[in-house]
Amino acid sequence: MTTRCVMVLGTTSGAGKSWLTAALCRWYARQGLKVAPFKAQNMSNNARVVGGGEIGSAQYFQALAARAVPDVRMNPLLLKPERDTHSQVVLMGQVSAELTAMPWRGRSERVWPQIAQALDALRAENDVVVIEGAGSPAEINLMASDIVNLRVARHADARCLLVTDIDRGGAFAHLYGTWALMPESDRALLRGFVLNKFRGDASLLAPAPQQLQALTGIATVATLPMWREHGLPEEDGVFDDRSHASGAVTRTVAVVAYPRISNLDEFQPLKNVPGVRLAWARTPAELAGADWIVLPGSKHTSGDLAWLRAQGLDRAIAAHAARGGAVLGVCGGLQMLGEALVDPHGIDGNAPGLGLLPLVTVFEREKTVRHRAAVFGQLGGAWASLSNVPVAGYEIHHGQTAIHPQMAQDGHAVMPEGLAWQNARGNVLGLYLHGLFEDAAALHALFGAAAPTLDATFDGLADFIDNHFEAGVLQGLIA
């Protein structure tokens, strides 16, 4: 068959593009087709390690949904925000210092040939490419430099769905306004409107879908009910701030939500572990009652550490640890738990650590990006159940961490090559490996239970859209 490209555009960020793209990937894969996802440019601090470097987490999961091997071509340009006005640029999996220093308008034309080449290569190798847009295609101030929405749609001759979040209100205005602001020649690419996150009786929407079709010539092809527990992380850049619990709560895990939090998607499985309540904390009050406090990854470790101190969270974490409460630091969180952050190259900034682990971290120019599998050594205290447990995960960091030479008695390595450290008391654990809570063996060791498998999650997504799209629409998009 001729390769078809199906594209998911959205009226806003957070409309549901990422999970709908994953659902489409699995739906088409279940038809026996060879499928790949694609997103030209992603802005996210949620990244995964693949062959050749790193890509946005959303495209990583979409590839798994498509039963494909994740590939840097699926997300050729990744922007990782470090400050409000500055992002690290990752091109084809590798950090580019040149592009990072370049104004974004000039950057767009520079990278477009590689984006087009990556997309063309995926089209040549697959039956279907499911493309995700970014934000809205009707941002008229950005159209001249667009490399992720309509320019991609035109290049791929994609059949596009436009999805909107009806729960926000104003969905029909969003759909009509987006259509109206699109260049007339591009409107022909739209094959259907999708209403996402609907609550209530869908018949009450009439006659709005029919009126919208009369105005635009485009039918509403799906009304998707609100479904919070679909099992995938929220769209990149959208922070799911609710706490989650599966069943009666026996343990509360509070993750500190600093401004430049990264790889927060690795905590997604905790939402579905029986007895575990996952909460996000920005204030000392939100840490109260936590059994475990987790300091996650950070794209700006010293800056997030300063923010943490300004909120008084440092004192709350120290008090929790002093009471014997369990504390876990992952990557940037591990670095914060140490004695000092040393930055000789101006990468992240110098800062004193929280002093809960006897470690010193030096930020190096070279970035470590790799898959890792390792085995915990003998642990004590709150983390004893992880003793001798194998864990598979990934590393993404500039820091290199070692024991403070004068404090060796206060802690020790509990994984080869300095991948994990524990304090002498046994209640504070630092880990460079991302993915602890995604590892089945680790989940079982920590909780005696496991979250649903990703494969079951993807099949659930495919079943959901199969039930709620108008008959024949999904097949018609690739006919």
Swiss-Prot record:
| Keywords (A to Z) from UniProt | Cobalamin biosynthesis, Glutamine amidotransferase
Checking Pfam families in the record gives: CbiA (PF01656), GATase_3 (PF07685)
Listed under GO biological process in this entry are: cobalamin biosynthetic process
For this protein, the record's SUPFAM superfamilies field holds: Class I glutamine amidotransferase-like (SSF52317), P-loop containing nucleoside triphosphate hydrolases (SSF52540)
The entry's family comment says: Belongs to the CobB/CobQ family. CobQ subfamily.
Q: HAMAP family of this UniProt entry? A: CobQ
Protein name as it appears in the record: Cobyric acid synthase
Identify the species of origin. Variovorax paradoxus (strain S110)
Taxonomic lineage:
Bacteria, Pseudomonadati, Pseudomonadota, Betaproteobacteria, Burkholderiales
